[in-house]
């Protein structure tokens, strides 16, 4: 009985994974082969040897980078089931010495990898939807003037829809992608039957001969070949939603065969009719099937874009929890799925950037020049973080870890260098976008550290303060006061201000701090730690993981089990509200101080972020010179 239930659950999760995980890599056939042989930058001449060489590169890239590296190796490095660059970074930092150069380097690498993800996430919806809609031009040139408007309308509609969540339509994503992969597999298989010679490309000798025989052109071609593996990192990033097995089963049993059949089918078509390089994906289909194929491709690319958008929301939430990003408004779009969230600020930022991209580049071929460098950069960083995990957590020797990762590093480095020559043609965009995000992340983290040091410099130790207060005869007023503070060992500034103004304290005083651990979730049984400092002074530490949704009222309800009863209607929350003043000659560059101050002013309120009832909050201001 249990085995049947497990099989049913596995099948359900595998179907769901098809609709989320494989949208990006699954829509790559729309433009990958076309870009290699018909792209605007360094197109490869269509000859039998070149076609077999490129198909061989596609085949072995999917086998080595996606199947061996991600499915077999990187997926083992999961943080309690969670994957993705942030989860990998936190995992790599385990057993490290806090503040050491190694830890700082791992953080910088992880943050830069996350920043590159945003650069990649901007391009994916643009190139995917644009390449799907470009199929209309194959049907009739009369559609050409409408390709950009249709693309923009589709993308704008997708982003406007985000605030409603995907709960209502998410169930359709899996079945649609099942149909998509079945269709592209059948189209490819039909072309292979006409020209089965392309199957010889499975032999890696063809890839080797292509690279050695074409030297510089072969190197440039790698910049387009990499398009077939973009989206491969999603297999690892989405582990937390579906688990490793459903993702692995879907890849090996369905997605990989469908992709290979389609790529080899496009190669067979090019050998039979080199003029089909105009758009080999759509020309695989019979004329009567091209309109439905454009419609199906558009839906598939919207699903692919949705996965990237959801990924951006998720990674931002993790960055907020870990203190790398200011608090932003987070809306939950599903009562059942905790992971379905909507961040308005990220949503509109991405939409504006994507609209600018589509208008500026104008075609999927032009956008392909911008695509790839962010993906390969993230893949390289993933290798380095995985080495740290292997050494620190799996107890591998550094030599064994380096040796195991070396083939993947060499391949990813080759792809990265091939894409770096396209920086002037558009590759600058994801790099510039990623660098801007990286500066924001690191500036916020460093600024928070400086602010903490300034506040701590003037603070008193909480335990000695409690002893002094006990014998001071300070008046007491009814109720409970909760003072939020980043450091539970120090007296909150808000408490000192309150005491200065009111000359009294509440009957029950709680000093509360929130601590985020480098694990995805903290169970409720470990949510709160309560320490009684005296009869009416308590210290509470609320503990969350980087994917938990902070909820202070819910945490307070758990305090009762730890012996601290708090009546919500008799409770007031006291929060500090600092006004920051930048200072020349500080530990941080002045321009970064100005940036941090601007971010600090525009950060979301702690009241909303921690779900504290606004009518129970008192904010006490102070000035802090950085």
Curated annotation (Swiss-Prot):
Catalyses which reaction?
A: K(+)(in) + H(+)(in) = K(+)(out) + H(+)(out)
Q: What is its main location?
A: membrane
Keyword Cell inner membrane in the entry? The reply is yes
> Where does this polypeptide localize?
Cell inner membrane
Membrane topology classification: Multi-pass membrane protein
Q: Name one GO cellular component term.
A: plasma membrane
Q: What does this protein do?
A: Transport of potassium into the cell. Likely operates as a K(+):H(+) symporter.
Q: Which HAMAP family match?
A: Kup
Name of the protein? Probable potassium transport system protein Kup 3
Name the species this protein comes from.
Dechloromonas aromatica (strain RCB)
